């Protein structure tokens, strides 16, 4: 019983020492960025070279390789690192800041090419739009002509109605005036005969 109790306290300090060793080094992301900066290779630094640099300069545990892979993937997704070759944690990597300084010189060339290409595409589009615009006014003119033809048609009908209405009272007035004139003519010879 005494031997077992003496063995257990001896095991506890070993675990505490292992925890202390893991806290001696900075974050894996910081160590990876430092390794890439130290190499300064044009093609980018590989994962194996990053691991060697970290193991040589920092006190790292046995599970350092797996944690380096995870931290590399996180840095790539966040944009701190850019992968020049390979997929995932394998391949070569560069710092994103170094690439941003080089890329602006290349971007203006691409923008000039893009500015030239739309001009060529724009010419056929304008030609295609112009006949469509020319066709639309023709349709509008046809509609105006049809409307103009329909409008004069009702106007003569109205004129005919007004003429027929005016003609009827004129005829009636002539007939009425003619009737009283006849008896006056008959009465005049009678008066002349009496005087003689």
Swiss-Prot record:
Q: Which PROSITE patterns match?
A: H15 (PS51504)
Under the heading CDD domains, the entry gives:
H15 (cd00073)
In residue numbers, the region (Disordered) covers 1-29, 86-196
Q: Which GO terms describe its molecular function?
A: double-stranded DNA binding; nucleosomal DNA binding; structural constituent of chromatin
Subcellular localization is given as: Nucleus; Chromosome
The UniProt record lists the H15 domain at 24-97
Keywords of this entry: Chromosome, DNA condensation, DNA-binding, Nucleus
Q: Which GO terms fall under biological process for this protein?
A: chromosome condensation; negative regulation of DNA recombination; nucleosome assembly
**A single cellular component GO annotation:** nucleosome
Report biased composition (Basic residues) as residue ranges: 104-196
Q: Which family does it belong to?
A: Belongs to the histone H1/H5 family.
Q: What does this protein do?
A: Histones H1 are necessary for the condensation of nucleosome chains into higher-order structures. The histones H1.0 are found in cells that are in terminal stages of differentiation or that have low rates of cell division.
Name of the protein: Histone H1.0-B
- What is the species of this protein? Xenopus laevis (African clawed frog)
